[in-house]
Amino acid sequence: MNEDDKKLLSKDSDGLLTYEYIANHISSIDDELDYLIDNMMRVDLSGQFIVSAARYLFAIDAEHYNNAVSRLITAAIEKDREHRYIGDLLPLWGADYQDHVEELSKTDNNFRRIYKRLYPTGI
């Protein structure tokens, strides 16, 4: 990432530019990923692009991007107050996550927090 890229990303108003940068430079972002996530967390007030970035990185390589995905999920929970986007994260715990709600809620704090927000009486 060069200084021109950083200048461009500093003008990101909602997270879309940062998300696009991640998607378009996926093969070379490892060293800048923390910076990119910090930038996205700063500008994405709704959590929309944070959720998209978490899903994208998970789909590319869940193990390699585990820490980044975890940070993004935590940020999405905080940002998405209207719960418009965080529900899209639940399938990250498997297509059958609904069959394992109790177990996942006990073992994964992010899953528990998302599920509790979406289904406040479900746990």
Model-identified regions with their sequence ranges:
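Short linear sequence motifs
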Residues: D12-D14, I86, L104, D108
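Structural detector for internal amphipathic alpha-helices that build alpha-solenoid repeat scaffolds
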Residues: G15-S27, I50-A62, R81-W93, I114-I123
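Amphipathic alpha-helical scaffolding segments comprising HEAT/armadillo-like alpha-solenoid repeats
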Residues: M1-K6, S28-M40, A62-T74, A95-S105
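Residues at alpha-helix boundaries and short interhelical turns
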Residues: S27, D44, A76-D80, G94, ...
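Acidic, proline/glycine-rich low-complexity IDRs
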Residues: Q98-I123
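N-terminal low-complexity, intrinsically disordered segments
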Residues: K11-M41
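Context-gated lysine
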Residues: K6-K7, K11, K79, K106, ...
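HEAT-repeat alpha-solenoid elements in large eukaryotic scaffold proteins
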Residues: L8-T18, M41-V51, I73-E78
